[in-house]
Structures are given as C-alpha cells and as structure tokens.
C-alpha cells in the first residue's frame, strides 16, 4: 500500500476516474443553492441531485468529485471518537444512466488494489453487500475477492424517502488484531459493532429503483436510468494509508494540532486525554471553510451551528489553558493544509480571521453572562431548598451559552450541588432527534420524470430576437407526449425561441404564440429548462397546436425591458456593494422581476444608512455615466482573467457569457441585458433587511418604479409638512424636531408630577408595616396610572428602611399588576411572585430583589394581599 499525502490521495482519485472517462465536478459551496431541504452540503452527491432526479441531464454522464461537506447532527461526539468530524471531504464517482454495477465494482477494486494506483493489499479488504444482491456478490468474486471476505448485511439498502434507491456494497480495511483486543473478528462487521479494526473506506450505492414509501420494497419500480453514487471519506483513506491510529493523526489535522500545542504549552498525546486538541482542530476547519463560503455565526440555522462550534472550541481551548482569543490564529494553518485544492481559505484569510476573532470576543462576554445565569440558578436552588441542578437547565447552559457539561458540573459541585445527568441526556436526545428528523426529511432525491428526461430534440434561445418564426417539435400534455393539443395547459419545445427560460435569478419571459394567420393560439406563462437544457414553454392553449407546424413566437417586450433594467442594475449593485462594504459581500441569491429586483448577499451586520446612501449614489452615477454594455462568449479561465465574478452557486459549462458594463462591472451571466446603463434611468433602494445569519437582502426598483418611489416619498413629506404646519418642505424636519423636543419636555414634566404624587401617596402606603416569619413587610393596593408608577413606589421604598419586603398591587384598566421587592436574602422576589401571581390569574418572574407579574382577575386582589405572609 502506498503511503500518500492527503493531497496526493485526492489527486490520484480524480486522475483515476478521469482515466475512466469521468468529468471532474468542482467542489461546490458548503451553503446549498436552491435547495431548502439542506442546511449544509453534507455529501458528495448532495450537489448532483438535479442529475439523479432527471431534472437536468449532465453533459457527461460520468462524474467524479472531491466535495467539502459538513454534518453537525453528532457534534458532541467530535473529539471523543477516532473518526467523527463536522467538516470532512467526500471523494465520489457517479454514473448517471451510464455504467452500472459491474464497472463500478471492477473499477473500484482496480483503484484500491492496482500497484499503479493505491496498491492496497487485497487480503486486507472486506466487503459487505445486501443479501438479495447476488450480482454484487458474484462481481466481487469475479474480481478475485475471497468469499470469506464478503459479508451479507440486511441494512445494505440505501433509501431516503421517495426517489432513487437501491442496494449498496461497502468496502472496509482490516487494521488487524491489534485493534481487536477481544478477538471478535468478522462479527464486528456482521453485527455492526462499533470498532477500530474494520474501517469503512468506501460505499458504492447501486441506484436502480424509484423508492415509493407507499409500497413494499419488493414493488419498487426500476429507474428509467440506473445510477451509481459512491462516497469515500478522504480523512479515513488518509488515516489508513498514512498508518495513523485515528483520522486526527493525519496530515489533515496534525499541523493544526501542532499550532495548538504552541498556543497552549501542552503536548498532544495520541494515547492520552487529547479530546480538546481534536475538537479545536476539527471545528476550526469547519469554521474556516463555512465562513469562507459565506455562512456567518448567528442565532439561527447554519449561523447557530457555527456559533456553537466556535464556542465549543473556545471552551476546549480554556481547558488547555488558552484564555485569550486564539482560534483566528489557526485559520492560516487550515488554509495552508488545503491550499492545493481549496485556495479560497487563504484568499479570504483576512475576512475569516476577522469574523472568528470578533465572535471569540463576543463569546468572552457571553461566558460572563452564562456564569451569571448559573449563579442565579444555584441561588434559586438554595432558596427552594433543592440540591440538584435540573437537566433542562444544564442543557440551556450548554445550548444557549455554550457551557460544556463538564464545566457546569465542576462549578455546581464546587457549590455542593448535584447534577441531573439523565435529564440533560433526555433534553440532548430530544434536540438530536429533531436534527436527525430534519436530515432525513431533506435527503430525498425526488422522483425521476421519464417524459421530460426523454426530450432530446434540439432547441436554441435567440438572445437578439423578441419575435421569430419557429417549428414546434414537442408537445407534452398531462405528462405525456402528444402530436396535438387544443385546450388546457401544455408544455412546448420549439427549434428556436426568443423566450428566456428562468435562470440565474432572471424570471422567464411571457408572451404569445401565433399561427400563420396571425391568430393567438397560446399564451406563454412560464419558461423553464428541460432536463436536457431545452427551453420548456408552459402555455395556456387557446386554439389547436400541432407538432411539425411553424408558429410565430412573440415575447412581451415591455415586460422584458423592465426585467432587463432590474437585472443590469443588479450587476451594478453587486459591484457597488464590493466597493462600499467589502469584497466579502458576495451574491447569495437574486431575483430580477418586472417590478423590482431583490439581491441577497453575505454580510455580518446591517448595512448602515450612510452605506446605503453611498451604494445608491454609486449605482446611479454608473447609470448616468452612459456605460456601454457588451457580452462576450469565451471559456471560464479567460473570463476569470478578464476579472469576471462567478456568481454564487452557479455551474458553468465550457463556454460562458461575460457581461461587461463599461470598466465598472464584469460578471459571468447567462441572462439578458440592456445595451447601455443609461437605459436603467434611475435606481432606488427601498428596503434593506436581514434574512438569516450572515445574509442581508436589498430590494430596489428602477426606471418608472424608482420615480414613483421618490414621488411617494415626496408626497409623504408634503403630508408631514402640512401636519406640522411647516411653511416649506425644507422646514419640515426642523418643525418635527421642535415638536419632538416639546413632547419630550412635557413627558419629563409628567414623570416628575407622577413621582411627586407617588411620593405623597407612599407616605400613607409605607405606614402599614406587618411582620411574619421574622420578616417585616408592606402589602398594599395602590391607585396608579401605569406599571411604571409601581416601580417608582419601589424606588422610594428602597431609599429608606421601611421594611424588608414590599408587595404592591394595582388594577390598571382590565389588568392587574403586581410588584414584589426584597431587601433581604431570605426572600427571593422572583420566587415569591410566582406564588402570588396565579391568585389573580397571572404569571410573572424576576430577580431576587425585584419582580413583576400581570394578571386578569381583579376580584382576587384582597386574597392576594392576604396570602403575602404565607408566601414569604
């Protein structure tokens, strides 16, 4: 077996499959594009779903890739085991309706065992297979595999929901008896026992059925096109080929671990307690790549995942004695390890470091808040006479504040409290079940559509035409091909068309189809790409249409022009964002409609009003600069040399279109555009908002809609000016400010009057002092205008030694407001109010010294006041 670096393994994999006629699919962005079922790209096949479900036919049915992936449903196991990772690299080879079982197995065995390639010893390889899949068993035998090395496993059948499914055969490497201390042998495989002896290095999925959850597996229908989907973990291959005990001792992780040794002053011991080193090395890889791909830490979705990873890594850094910010210092090492195939980490190093460091600094403040929350929980336990910290509270510390259970346990036990481990495990399992359910839900490939996949007739989109005559070559009605149609809705393919199919954020053209008499026979309401790339026109049929007949196709020119204004403005906006807020502001989605444009981009905070003003100004300057717009067809490399930006998530063929707007913007784009920037007329941003962690959205309008937006603003300003009696529009702001200042003065005067009234009333309230359980207390109903007055009472009470506890109740409108304040450690205001509030059909809470509640039953106020003594 050859001893290869991880980079050599990856390259040899790709080279082998290229020698078998495969095209190399570049690694896709970790943030899924147009796939709401996935939080992350989590496998090599995840980016190829459109090929497997038949919605798109690839140029080459043989594909290979090395795909960066993230899975986070078992984060807590990372660092504890030899092979759990959040980010990993999946090597794959795929056949879309081309070769099948025989070639997949034969070529896989060749790659693994040939001296020209990996040169694995054949006697160290074991294969599992689905018991009913005798064809795979026989093919392995034909390759020279001993029958004793073939293990039938009932679970070797791959299916996730509806869509492509089939048996799979897995390949394992035997590391020998040293990793099997109990000498269990092949039972480890046959009974699926977790072990370190037999390492799964490759899984070959034979996708031959359309799974249907409504019928038994034996009744699944054969796919119209059988597929091969395989996955081999680079980290596992590297561990085996480099003789490493775990994946972490390979060249993918050890350089990071060495840097952590320098930062901590601790030494990594492969046989000792090294969990913290592993966690940090794993998590900083995931963070570096995910942030580089546009995801940012936040409180929801993938942003929450990144925040959790970073906080877990920071806490493990503290366990190693690293108390300052340090993770960001590891980003260059991650980039250097992966540079040969993933240069983007080093290219975006400054931005990634900035985000990681800022998040570390934020977490340092969060740790203080978490410690305060734990202190509050322990104080509450003491007040309630309890000795165990509940599992749900431990989980909240873990989930919300990033506190490892070990830290919570240590601090709680130092204060002589026990830990509810079972309750914590239950809360953790509930979260994991939700996560796994979401993963399963999102895994379906979708059913193949044989009718659409069967369209092979050629069709060409004419960029320069808004009307042309073309021959109708395909009609599909009710999901069946037909020669003619006279009513209802149908899908049409023409030899040539002026209708743009929705793509790259630009909506489809609308229009009409006319016969040779000039009569409209169909209305085009949508155009999408067929699996083989042809524009597929969705039409409402008004009169007879037949295959082989010529028709005149006319787009709605006014709609197209409006869409082109917005699309061209989108390119200008993208460039302006780069110039104003930074090159990290890359496209994360766009929509160019007739009435508006919508542009999503990566950014870690709201765009300020001043920045929006600069962006809007810059876009309009380019419109007024009368810039010529040109399109050029070339190859991807030449386009990039021209400075063209490749848009987020798009896949490009051998020939690409470059859209250049003067010297200001150069992008790869397949859409339609204006001839000159001045045709846009005017550009106005109408909204900027966050749509998720690290993603912002700008909605803007152009041309007539931009003019109307400005006119609406002017009308609103005129109305405001009239309301505040400003003599001219320019005076409106000053008049509004003057009114605001006057209102503030009146409000201040009102507060002062209320405080004086409350102070006067307090004299009577504070006279009625009672005592119970050795605690002096005041309990009274007061007549106030709002809940704020209750707090004013409490502030006055705190300034003098009237009593230890104050309870005030007020009926305000239809609501009952309750306040409890305490000066003594013997009475916890927050706990006390939880006992009182239900009496008036309310609830509330608060801190040890002050708490408030709201209720709805004013008839029970006297009962509440009478219950104060027993609730002390």
Swiss-Prot record:
It comes from Streptococcus agalactiae serotype Ia (strain ATCC 27591 / A909 / CDC SS700). InterPro entries: aa-tRNA-synth_II/BPL/LPL, Ala-tRNA-lgiase_IIc, Ala-tRNA-ligase_IIc_anticod-bd, Ala-tRNA-synth_IIc_core, Ala-tRNA-synth_IIc_N, Ala-tRNA_ligase, Ala_tRNA_ligase_euk/bac, DHHA1_dom. Consists of three domains; the N-terminal catalytic domain, the editing domain and the C-terminal C-Ala domain. The editing domain removes incorrectly charged amino acids, while the C-Ala domain, along with tRNA(Ala), serves as a bridge to cooperatively bring together the editing and aminoacylation centers thus stimulating deacylation of misacylated tRNAs. This is Alanine--tRNA ligase. Catalyzes the attachment of alanine to tRNA(Ala) in a two-step reaction: alanine is first activated by ATP to form Ala-AMP and then transferred to the acceptor end of tRNA(Ala). Also edits incorrectly charged Ser-tRNA(Ala) and Gly-tRNA(Ala) via its editing domain. GO terms for cellular component: cytosol. Its cofactor is Zn(2+). It catalyses: tRNA(Ala) + L-alanine + ATP = L-alanyl-tRNA(Ala) + AMP + diphosphate. Keywords: Aminoacyl-tRNA synthetase, ATP-binding, Cytoplasm, Ligase, Metal-binding, Nucleotide-binding, Protein biosynthesis, RNA-binding, tRNA-binding, Zinc.
């Amino acid at each position: 077996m050859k001893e290869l670096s991880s980079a050599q393994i990856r390259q040899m994999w790709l080279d082998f499959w290229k020698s078998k006629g495969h095209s190399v699919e570049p690694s896709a962005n970790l943030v899924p594009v147009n796939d709401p079922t996935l939080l992350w790209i989590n496998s090599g096949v995840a980016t190829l779903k459109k090929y497997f479900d038949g919605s798109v036919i690839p140029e080459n049915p043989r594909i290979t890739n090395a795909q960066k992936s993230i899975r986070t449903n078992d984060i807590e196991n990372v660092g504890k085991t030899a092979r759990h990772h959040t980010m990993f690299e999946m090597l794959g080879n795929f056949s879309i309706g081309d070769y099948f079982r025989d070639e997949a197995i034969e070529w896989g065995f060749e790659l693994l065992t040939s001296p020209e390639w990996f040169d694995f010893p054949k006697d160290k390889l074991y294969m599992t297979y689905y018991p009913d899949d005798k064809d795979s068993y026989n093919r392995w035998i034909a390759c020279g595999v001993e029958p004793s090395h073939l293990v039938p496993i009932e679970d070797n059948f791959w299916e996730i929901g509806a869509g492509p499914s089939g048996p799979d055969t897995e390949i394992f490497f035997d590391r020998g008896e040293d990793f099997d201390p109990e000498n269990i042998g092949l039972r480890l495989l046959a009974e699926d026992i977790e072990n370190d002896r037999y390492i799964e290095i490759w899984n070959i999925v034979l996708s031959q059925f359309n799974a249907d959850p409504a019928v038994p597996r034996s009744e699944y229908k054969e796919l119209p096109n059988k597929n091969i989907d395989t996955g081999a973990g680079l980290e596992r291959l590297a561990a085996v080929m480099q003789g490493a005990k775990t994946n972490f001792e390979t060249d993918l992780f050890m350089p990071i671990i060495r840097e952590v040794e320098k930062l901590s002053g601790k030494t990594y011991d492969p046989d000792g307690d090294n969990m913290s080193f592993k966690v940090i090395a794993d998590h900083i890889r995931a963070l570096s790549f995910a942030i580089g791909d546009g995801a940012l830490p936040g409180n929801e979705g993938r942003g929450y995942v990144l925040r959790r990873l970073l906080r877990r890594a920071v806490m493990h850094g503290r366990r190693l004695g690293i108390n300052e910010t340090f993770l960001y210092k590891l980003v260059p090492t991650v980039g250097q390890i992966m540079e040969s195939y993933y240069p983007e980490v080093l290219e975006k190093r400054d931005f990634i470091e900035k985000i990681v460091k800022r998040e570390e600094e934020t977490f340092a403040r969060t740790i203080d808040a978490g410690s305060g929350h734990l202190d509050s929980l322990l104080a509450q336990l003491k007040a309630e006479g309890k000795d165990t910290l509940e599992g749900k509270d431990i989980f909240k510390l873990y989930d919300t504040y990033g506190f490892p259970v070990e830290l919570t346990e240590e601090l709680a036990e130092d204060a002589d409290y026990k830990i509810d481990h079972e309750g914590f495990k239950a809360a953790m399992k509930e979260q994991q079940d939700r996560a796994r359910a979401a993963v399963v839900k999102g895994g379906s490939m979708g059913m193949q559509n044989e009718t659409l996949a069967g369209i092979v007739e050629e069709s060409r989109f004419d960029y320069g035409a808004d009307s042309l005559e073309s021959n109708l070559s395909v009609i599909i009605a009710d999901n069946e091909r037909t020669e003619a149609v006279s009513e209802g809705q149908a899908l049409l393919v023409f030899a040539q068309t002026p209708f743009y199919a929705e793509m790259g954020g630009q909506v489809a053209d609308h229009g009409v189809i006319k016969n040779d008499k000039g009569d409209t026979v169909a209305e085009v309401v949508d155009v999408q790409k067929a699996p083989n790339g042809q524009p597929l026109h969705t039409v409402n049929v008004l009169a007879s249409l037949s295959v082989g007949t010529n028709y005149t196709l006319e787009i709605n020119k006014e709609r197209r022009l409006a869409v082109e204004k917005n699309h061209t403005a989108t390119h200008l906006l993208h460039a302006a964002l780069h110039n104003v807020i930074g090159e990290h502001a890359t496209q994360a989605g766009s929509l160019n409609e007739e009435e508006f444009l919508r542009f999503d981009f990566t950014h870690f905070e709201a765009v300020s009003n001043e920045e929006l003003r600069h962006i809007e100004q810059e876009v309009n300057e380019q419109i007024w600069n009368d810039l010529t717009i040109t399109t050029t067809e070339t190859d991807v490399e030449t386009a990039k040399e021209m400075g063209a930006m490749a848009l987020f998530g798009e896949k490009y063929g051998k020939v690409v279109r470059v859209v250049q707007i003067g010297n200001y913007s150069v992008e790869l784009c397949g859409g339609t555009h204006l001839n000159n920037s001045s045709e846009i007329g005017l550009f106005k941003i109408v909204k900027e908002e966050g749509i998720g962690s690290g993603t912002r959205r700008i909605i803007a309008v152009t041309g007539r809609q931009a003019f109307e937006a400005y006119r609406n603003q002017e009308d609103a300003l005129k109305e405001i000016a009239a309301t505040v009696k400003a003599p001219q529009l320019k005076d409106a702001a000053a008049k509004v400010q003057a009114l605001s200042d006057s209102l503030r003065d009146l409000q201040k005067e009102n507060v002062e009057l209320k405080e004086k009234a409350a102070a006067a009333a307090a004299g009577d309230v504070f006279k009625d002092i009672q005592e119970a359980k050795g605690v002096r207390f005041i309990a009274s109903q007061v007549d106030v205008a709002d809940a704020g007055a209750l707090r004013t009472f409490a502030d006055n009470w705190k300034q003098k030694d009237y009593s230890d506890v104050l309870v005030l109740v007020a009926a305000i409108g239809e609501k009952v407001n309750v306040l409890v304040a305490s000066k003594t450690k013997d009475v916890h205001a927050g706990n006390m109010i939880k006992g009182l509030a239900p009496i008036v059909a309310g609830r509330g809470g608060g801190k040890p010294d002050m708490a408030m509640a709201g209720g709805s039953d004013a008839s029970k106020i006297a009962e509440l006041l009478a219950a104060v003594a027993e609730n002390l």
